[in-house]
Amino acid sequence: MKITKRIAFDAAHRLLGYDGPCARLHGHRYILEVTLEGTRLDELGMLEDFKSVSSKLKEGPFASWDHRTLLSKEDPLVSFVEEAYLMDKNPTAENMLLEFVEKWGYGFNTAFTRLHSVKLFETPDCSAELIL
């Protein structure tokens, strides 16, 4: 069985070395989906309490990424931007998913559930997904 929780956040980013408009600073209304899987329900009939999943998302990526500028540590804008979240790599949707799993993914695994996948929408019709 699987359950999925979504959370939305707003952030700006740009891509160093990209030949196109995404090289300029711009923003997105991101949607992050986290899917957990397991085989056992608790005594209330839940795989995992959605409230618990939501709290983990709010304390992790939402607190770090919402209303921030996501930049590569190599970006010359770093010294000019307040409230920046710095990444080792370009802040692509794919790299953001890898960052999510590395920093917060372990917190979603319990005795009876595990993190199955994370999906990040940059726009309503463009997303990246990491299946674990």
Features from the language model and the residues they span:
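Charge-rich, low-complexity N-terminal segments
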Residues: 1-132
